[in-house]
Amino acid sequence: MSEIQEISKKEQYNLNKLQKRLRRNVGEAIADYNMIEEGDRIMVCLSGGKDSYTMLEILRNLQQSAPVNFSLVAVNLDQKQPGFPEHILPEYLSSLGVEYKIVEENTYGIVKEKIPEGKTTCSLCSRLRRGILYRTATELGATKIALGHHRDDILQTLFLNMFYGGKMKGMPPKLMSDDGKHIVIRPLAYCREKDIERFSQAKGFPIIPCNLCGSQPNLQRQVIADMLRDWDKRYPGRIETMFSAMQNVVPSHLCDTELFDFKGIHHGSEVVNGGDLAFDREEIPMMPAGWTPEDDAAPPMQRLDVLEIK
């Protein structure tokens, strides 16, 4: 076997392994949150980025072996950004035989008109997109709207809300839409961004960059993303542990009086789950919760250097 054939064989092996992991992650998220049910018509929101391409690919793959029958329709919102390659998505989706709809709305013009030069456009752009996608879901008879946010997006949102909003609020894997008419799901909720990026590169998806918001410097989310990437590189398992913490909340050991009745604690009250930590320190496991090395090398642990968040 030639060296080129050997490399190709190894690349295919790694791609298969990566796809299986993504399939497993998506399958577990779907099962844990009951994202997809018998007869569902899933509107897959396709932006032309690595995340939405990967979501569509994995859902199509799972569709062949899922215990329930569901259909997919891909939807792209053409926001009329200058230089947007309108032909790429229709050609790609047609080649796959996937049902799709391209929605043309000049949200780019609205955002540029309303937002002063130098200010971030994400908030207004997101609101405009959301309303259009809800309307489109109704027109298509979709029962679920699938978005391509992954585990890293969810953690970034948690830290954004803690650092800047004073709230412990993330990005739910499943929720009711703002208009109360649609269920929104995030099938990639358990998937790592670095897995998605590697999968996207290996598959050669025709990526379309977002010129509206992707090039804005010093976004708060980008600062948080850089911090998390740094932690992931230097402290293997930290990201997994933090995400695991979002799934293991103990309201009695936080400070939110809406979540737990602290005033109702009296002599003779029942002991709450979580234990008594008034005098004893909680035992912390040596290995991070939820972390498995998989194929990632584990560099030596380092002392924490606190990053400055502005």
From Swiss-Prot:
The keyword Repeat does not apply. Keywords: 4Fe-4S, ATP-binding, Cytoplasm, Iron, Iron-sulfur, Magnesium, Metal-binding, Nucleotide-binding, RNA-binding, Transferase, tRNA processing, tRNA-binding. Its cofactor is Mg(2+); [4Fe-4S] cluster. SUPFAM superfamilies: Adenine nucleotide alpha hydrolases-like. Its main location: cytoplasm. Its EC number is 2.8.1.-. This is tRNA-cytidine(32) 2-sulfurtransferase.
